[in-house]
Amino acid sequence: MTIHNHTLGFPRVGLRRELKKAQESYWAGKSTREELLAVGRELRARHWEQQKAAGIDLLPVGDFAWYDHVLTTSLLLGNVPARHQNADGTVDIDTLFRIGRGRAPTGEPAAAAEMTKWFNTNYHYMVPEFTKGQQFSLTWTQLLDEVDEALALGHHVKPVLLGPVTYLWLGKVKGEQFDRLSLLNDILPVYQQVIAELAKRGIQWVQIDEPALVLELPQAWLDAFKPAYEALKGQTKLLLTTYFEGVSDNLDTITALPVQGLHVDLVHGHDDVNELHRRLPQEWLLSAGVINGRNVWRADLTEKYAQLKAIAGQRELWVGSSCSLLHSPIDLSVETRLDAEVKSWFAFALQKCEELALLRDALNSGDTTKIEQWSAPIQARKHSARVHNPAVEQRLKAITPQDSQRAHAYPVRAEAQRARFNLPAWPTTTIGSFPQTTEIRGLRLDFKKGNLDAANYRTGIAEHIKQAIAEQERLGLDVLVHGEAERNDMVEYFGEHLDGFVFTQNGWVQSYGSRCVKPPVVIGDISRPAPITVEWAKYAQSLTDKPVKGMLTGPVTILCWSFPREDVSRETIAKQIALALRDEVADLEAAGIGIIQIDEPALREGLPLKRSDWDAYLAWGVEAFRLNAAVAKDDTQIHTHMCYCEFNDIMDSIAALDADVITIETSRSDMELLESFEEFEYPNEIGPGVYDIHSPNVPDVAWIEALLKKAAQRIPQERLWVNPDCGLKTRGWPETRAALANMVKAAQNLRQA
């Protein structure tokens, strides 16, 4: 039996982020819809051709999305919230953009759909909305049109469809509550219609993605798969596709389904391929996801070959990416600034396609010469001085439990901090960043390009910090920040100043819609060669008698928003970062900075997909934070900031961080989030966000006062702070001034009440 290869999907944005530029041009009214559609066609044609040229047998179609593939599925099913519908009932690309962004070149603006993380990745999807008695119909033929496009170009294709059970799992009920799983029989006819249309086009295999099968699902949801796939069987072969974790726990459910193949993620799961071979029906195809679709590392193909060799020829076998290559940058060959050694360790999406071709050929021929050559740099990396720093490894081994304990418990620290800072009731502060103006961005860009020397750059940054301090003093804030003018991104900035990280020029991956991120890559042991934030914090503090917060990004967030190493555990990386930043805390303290904020917005999103794995993750995540912070003296106040919509299930861990003050995002939930802290009897201080910084709207004083009074019903007033929801870097100065003035006024009114 000949072994074939395939990918589960390919990056959409284009090597030079062409899709992003076309989207934003269209949204701004600078280009036409036809011009936007033409860019999409050009990108799809190029990406199919590139994958084919790299040696991919079966090309994915339907992985392209104008905003998000879950949103594409919503349109396919005719699931358009009433507020986003066209007056004439039709669906077009602007309908899609209104759901994603709240506005489009045509139609009335309306609140965008909710956006949340796609499983445990850094990609975000638009949450489907379900209402009782909802009707579904095939209204958006993008998948069929793109299949026709690919077939016309002569490609051998495999359409990609998000499966019905996972689609319902990912959504939320709006309005009257009901069980959204009850909609399964209503959406299945649309799926049947789509699969019938694909069969008419001569399609043999359809990749139907059901990543929910890697979760610890309630029994009712597991039971739903059998009737769903009974309804879909028969017209084409179905490749049931899972990723991001293993499927062993749900294998009994899976093997009872009337499908013809199963794709498993053999990178992130712990499934044994020989056990899968033994338990799957013999006539099924097994697609082995052995090439990591969500990292940048070259694969050890000799290891992958050994993993699969025993079952090659025993059943129909494909080799594939672990998940869609959406989560990987496109092409390593355009990275001209990486040195040859480091570059030899990497593989981006196109190189991962080449890996799949090399692995397929070796398994078919038995000749391992080429895969041995490919894997040689991986062996060399194991001994590279770029990777291993004996001093870091030694320091990690020397950690004791005492290293993650503050000198005294919170009540003792709180007394020392009150004596030091003497803050008023309802103390006001911000989360850290101030508007990143075109002047600030231009200053950083000129310096990066070499058009501005270091002295003039520093003078410029100092001036922006001075302005930020002056603005805050005018507004009457109690605890100030320096505004972060020198920082492009809260993770990238620290990565640039820590040994063990490298940066790419074009390593962009899609985060959501037109937003792309360029994550740093952890290539080796992490250490801090010199202080990072001390100089600017010290300068800002010299400009005022009020306390200025030192601002750090926490170890778990830096880990989660980077491409991590694969040769050590995530726990090891987090603790290395924590030790490096521990030294930063000590240096800030020595420089006279008395309040230090360590942001951990990613602590919750780093949770493993299986709940049974949560405790182990949270244990080391909390320890990393404490290791970072515990060097601080009693009268140094440690803050942390988190932006989650759910705290209930991790409250123990939030409390275990033992931060003196936690600031959280609560304005959009009308302070409901504080219920978790009240029920838990959270012992330390809390700053519930009093206005939503994601909106340009300026909250009025009475509204903020009402929110704070509501907060004081749940949390003792002496432990409450007053602050916005999040950092202000994306806002303009006019609305920032107005909103903060109202926030300060509300706090002053409550002090006098």
Swiss-Prot record:
Keywords from the named record: Amino-acid biosynthesis, Metal-binding, Methionine biosynthesis, Methyltransferase, Repeat, Transferase, Zinc
Binding-site list for Zn(2+): 641, 643, 665, 726
Gene Ontology MF terms in the entry: 5-methyltetrahydropteroyltriglutamate-homocysteine S-methyltransferase activity; zinc ion binding
Alphabetical list of Pfam families matching this protein: Meth_synt_1, Meth_synt_2
Enzyme Commission designation: 2.1.1.14
Superkingdom, natural source: Bacteria
Pathway(s) per entry: Amino-acid biosynthesis; L-methionine biosynthesis via de novo pathway; L-methionine from L-homocysteine (MetE route): step 1/1
Top-level enzyme category: transferase
Family annotation (InterPro entries): Cbl-indep_Met_Synth_N, Cobalamin-indep_Met_synthase, Met_Synth_C/arc, UROD/MetE-like_sf
NCBIfam families found in the cross-reference section: met_syn_B12ind (TIGR01371), PRK05222.1 (NF003556)
Function recorded in the entry: Catalyzes the transfer of a methyl group from 5-methyltetrahydrofolate to homocysteine resulting in methionine formation.
Protein name (Swiss-Prot/TrEMBL): 5-methyltetrahydropteroyltriglutamate--homocysteine methyltransferase
